[in-house]
Amino acid sequence: MSGFLPFSRPAMGVEELAAVKEVLESGWITTGPKNQALEQAFCQLTGNQHAIAVSSATAGMHITLMALEIGKGDEVITPSLTWVSTLNMISLLGATPVMVDVDRDTLMVTPEAIEAAITPRTKAIIPVHYAGAPADIDAIRAIGERYGIAVIEDAAHAVGTYYKGRHIGAKGTAIFSFHAIKNITCAEGGLIVTDNENLARQLRMLKFHGLGVDAYDRHTWGRAPQAEVLTPGYKYNLTDINAAIALTQLVKLEHLNTRRREIAQQYQQALAALPFQPLSLPAWPHVHAWHLFIIRVDEQRCGISRDALMEALKERGIGTGLHFRAAHTQKYYRERFPTLSLPNTEWNSERICSLPLFPDMTTADADRVITALQQLAGQ
């Protein structure tokens, strides 16, 4: 048997090593010029006006919710089929996450489900661009505008995703992730884009102790050695070491996503003859970033359960992922919302499995996964 094929592996090369070396030798290794360059690059990529680099997408979500003054008594609409950090940040601020169902086959939250969940207490809507495909953000944003509710796009899966000809985050507010498995990575990191100047100003303060400027700003422009606290804030800034890696990865984005697309197409062709069900593609015009390739494993249809399939693939030296176990089925949220029923979310949460997908995979690697799936399907 070949060596273990992981579910994901970052595509790092000599360029990233050189970028880190440059920062280490520069004498300025924390937040500085590489952060500024990364923010400018994301404004250029998305077409949005402001970009704020942070230590993680979770940190970005936290301070965005804070800047919108979301707290006790407020409600925030979000799918349950998302990473739990979104629910956690809402809860930690004292607000109530209002979890809604998703489309059964795209796993996208729908405008209809969002609008049905709105109450006088609704303060924000957080749609997820899932697995690298875009949600119907025009329709969702129109709901937000009609009711005067903020829309925060969870774009953690969407670096390189386009919706109706525009990159995700082209307008409004969106949060990207540079976590180790994402389409571009710097190990840990995130970035917020927004067209709201006041929100951008608040986010810059909240990410760095509530100060009006960061350490590099003060050092470079000769400002007062101790800036004044304008509001209580956090330590969510990104180091230039991380930013330099992210910048280098961003240069490679088209190549990295092209390779992801090729592997996804290889899977799609093979799955046409297998009982495992891939996700449907959104009906609206889009470019898929293929952050994840997900199949649904229905035991009656496939002759094997999802958990048994994942274990069998592991025994064959193939890693898989689960994105995600529905938040409302996990202990804290299950006990907090014991009567919540989301049929499409629950059906998928019990069946979804993420296959290996990363740019350094070879055609032979994908063939190995396909052969294993064929064997497990009895073919």
From Swiss-Prot:
Acyltransferase in keyword set: no
Keywords: Aminotransferase, Antibiotic resistance, Lipid A biosynthesis, Lipid biosynthesis, Lipid metabolism, Lipopolysaccharide biosynthesis, Pyridoxal phosphate, Transferase
Reactions catalysed according to its record: UDP-4-amino-4-deoxy-beta-L-arabinose + 2-oxoglutarate = UDP-beta-L-threo-pentopyranos-4-ulose + L-glutamate
Cofactor: pyridoxal 5'-phosphate
UniProt GO BP: lipid A biosynthetic process; lipopolysaccharide biosynthetic process; response to antibiotic
Pathway of action: Nucleotide-sugar biosynthesis; UDP-4-deoxy-4-formamido-beta-L-arabinose biosynthesis; UDP-4-deoxy-4-formamido-beta-L-arabinose from UDP-alpha-D-glucuronate: step 2/3; Bacterial outer membrane biogenesis; lipopolysaccharide biosynthesis
EC nos: 2.6.1.87
Residues forming coiled coils: none
A molecular function (GO) term: UDP-4-amino-4-deoxy-L-arabinose aminotransferase
UniProt modified residues of type N6-(pyridoxal phosphate)lysine: K182
GO cellular component term of the entry, any: membrane
InterPro entries according to UniProt: ArnB_NH2Trfase, DegT/StrS_aminotransferase, PyrdxlP-dep_Trfase, PyrdxlP-dep_Trfase_major, PyrdxlP-dep_Trfase_small
A Pfam family reported for this protein in Swiss-Prot or TrEMBL: DegT_DnrJ_EryC1
Function: Catalyzes the conversion of UDP-4-keto-arabinose (UDP-Ara4O) to UDP-4-amino-4-deoxy-L-arabinose (UDP-L-Ara4N). The modified arabinose is attached to lipid A and is required for resistance to polymyxin and cationic antimicrobial peptides.
Homology family: Belongs to the DegT/DnrJ/EryC1 family. ArnB subfamily.
Self-association state and partner proteins as the record states: Homodimer.
Name of the protein: UDP-4-amino-4-deoxy-L-arabinose--oxoglutarate aminotransferase
